[in-house]
């Protein structure tokens, strides 16, 4: 399990900057082996942030934290009650094109907390932020497709350790759910999301961050991302929330392989 100590935070809002290529890579400049380069050379990995946190729009309780190793992470919630935060790349990507992203997640507090985070494709803009608690920070972001990593069992949830595909900003209805064999809370894990635009196929994989861990396919669903998000070009990023139970909800080593809009 990775262990790092936070040193400093940036300001709550960090915006601006342009991407020089068609690929976004957040917090680390190494491309995962699973994301193959396109033959036309439009896909190339590079950092989308610097020490000032440009190229990110941070909303609500989201902030950018620097660890003692120099690594930066997005903290969506800081273990306060009824928090919600979102973080978006400020550069749009083609939602009607094939896409892959990977990132590490650490959801933690002194006791089992809530509520979880989500990765979104959305067409509403870099200031989008939804509701707290079971809203996962995405409730009301209607032009969106979300993959949720949920650590609290609300009324319509199967359990307190599940993944879900959520459409149109409504976390009370799931297109699909799955229960991973690893805990989503208390230990960091790796997630990978792949979208095949030709087949409208969304796949979600998870893997623990321990020796000999194996990546597992958890969700494999048909969804037209561009149609559901209401736009051929849109934003990608994260939301997260807490309610009466709390959690520190961190995302790091975020890499995106997608055509620039």
Where are these regions (language model features)?
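Secretory targeting and sorting signals
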Residues: 2-37
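Polar, low-complexity loop segments and adjacent catalytic/binding residues used for recognizing
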Residues: 36-261
């Amino acid at each position: 399990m990775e262990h790092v100590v936070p040193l400093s935070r940036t300001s709550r809002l960090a915006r601006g900057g342009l991407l020089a290529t068609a690929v976004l890579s957040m917090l680390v400049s190494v491309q995962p082996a699973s994301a193959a380069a396109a033959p036309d050379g439009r896909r190339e990995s590079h950092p989308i942030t610097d020490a000032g946190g440009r190229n990110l729009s941070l909303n609500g309780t989201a902030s950018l934290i620097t660890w003692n190793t120099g690594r930066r992470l997005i903290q969506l919630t800081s273990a306060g009650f009824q928090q919600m935060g979102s973080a978006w790349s400020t550069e749009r990507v083609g939602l009607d094109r094939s896409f892959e992203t990977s990132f590490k997640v650490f959801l933690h507090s002194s006791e089992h907390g809530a509520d979880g985070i989500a990765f979104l494709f959305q067409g509403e803009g870099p200031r989008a932020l939804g509701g707290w608690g079971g809203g996962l920070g995405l409730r009301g972001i209607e032009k969106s497709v979300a993959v949720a990593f949920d650590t609290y069992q609300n009324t319509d949830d199967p359990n307190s350790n599940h993944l879900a595909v959520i459409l149109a900003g409504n976390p009370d209805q799931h297109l699909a759910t799955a229960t991973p064999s690893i805990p989503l809370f208390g230990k960091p894990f790796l997630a990978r999301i792949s979208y095949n635009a030709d087949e409208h196929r969304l796949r979600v994989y998870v893997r623990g961050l321990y020796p000999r861990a194996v990546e597992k396919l958890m969700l494999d669903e048909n969804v037209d991302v561009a149609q559901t998000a209401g736009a051929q070009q849109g934003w990608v990023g994260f939301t997260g929330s807490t309610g009466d139970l709390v959690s520190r909800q961190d995302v790091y080593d975020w890499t995106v392989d997608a055509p620039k809009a």
